[in-house]
């Protein structure tokens, strides 16, 4: 563009000696110069606009690149949470600290983390016992006994099975005849009511699950809620029994008893 301007100015200088030929030549020169000057100015304006446009595009492009780099370089913080969700401020996966896994010889289950192991042997074939720190009535036991049955269903219905292992329901202190209060019949000092029973299948293995409420004439928190899970494998009867007193059952112990027995399975 600079060379074009020089050529036009040089052409105007050469044409100037012809000024004496008449006013028409002057008018032609004037007319011929102005359009060229206008064109030059217009070209410069276009260049300026192009520079401004390119500058704007460059800024937008640079901003886009910066935003993209920030998006790629940034990492979502584990503390970020969607609306209505609790933020994990420490950035670690949340774990269920109320239970701890226990892997025994041929079985596994979840044990309440605040329960402690106990050496008390309450049943034949008992291989594990845990109890509540504050109330030994809340406890769980695992029994492994030899059997000639091939499946838990060989014991009959869940109720039939329970009648064959009724020692799991415990004993009370008094065995004499009495007319006790609390809804017991004359001469009856204990009762057991099956509240629920089911026959779940876990990994192709049949289980029995039975929930029982036992009550005795000698009291003991108004009764005990006992949950029994059982199955048979390789000539062995596996039983998991957990319980809690009636009062604690409704104050939160139910969750620990039911979760422990429902997690019980044979390897």
Swiss-Prot record:
Which Gene3D superfamilies would you find in this protein's record? Answer: Mog1/PsbP, alpha/beta/alpha sandwich (3.40.1000.10)
Name it: Oxygen-evolving enhancer protein 2, chloroplastic
Sequence similarity: Belongs to the PsbP family.
What upregulates or represses it?
A: By light.
Subcellular localization, per the record? Plastid, Chloroplast thylakoid membrane
Which GO terms fall under biological process for this protein? photosynthesis
Instruction: Cite the entry's keywords alphabetically.
Output: Chloroplast, Membrane, Photosynthesis, Photosystem II, Plastid, Thylakoid, Transit peptide
């Amino acid at each position: 563009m600079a060379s074009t301007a020089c050529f036009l100015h040089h052409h105007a200088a050469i044409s100037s000696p012809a000024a004496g030929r008449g006013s028409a030549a002057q008018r032609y020169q004037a007319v011929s110069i102005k359009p060229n000057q206008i064109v030059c100015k217009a070209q410069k304006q276009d260049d300026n606009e192009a520079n401004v446009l390119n500058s704007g595009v460059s800024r937008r492009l640079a901003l886009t690149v910066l935003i993209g780099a920030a998006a790629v370089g940034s990492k979502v913080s584990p503390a970020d949470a969607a609306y209505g969700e609790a933020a994990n401020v420490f950035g670690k996966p949340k774990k269920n600290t109320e239970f701890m896994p226990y892997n025994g010889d041929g079985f596994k289950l979840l044990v309440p983390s605040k329960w402690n192991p106990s050496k008390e042997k309450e049943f034949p074939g008992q291989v594990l016992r845990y109890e509540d720190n504050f109330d030994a009535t809340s406890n769980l036991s695992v029994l492994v006994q030899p059997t000639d049955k091939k499946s838990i269903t060989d014991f009959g219905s869940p109720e039939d099975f329970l009648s064959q292992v009724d020692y799991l329901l415990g004993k009370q202190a008094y065995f004499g005849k009495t007319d006790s209060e609390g809804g017991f019949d004359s001469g009856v000092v204990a009762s057991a009511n099956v509240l629920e029973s089911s026959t779940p299948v876990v990994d192709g293995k049949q289980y029995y699950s039975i929930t029982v409420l036992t009550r005795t004439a000698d009291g003991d928190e108004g009764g005990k809620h006992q949950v029994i899970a059982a199955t048979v494998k390789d000539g062995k009867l596996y039983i998991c029994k957990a319980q809690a007193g009636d009062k604690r059952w409704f104050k939160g112990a139910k969750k620990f008893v039911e979760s422990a027995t429902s997690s019980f399975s044979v390897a």
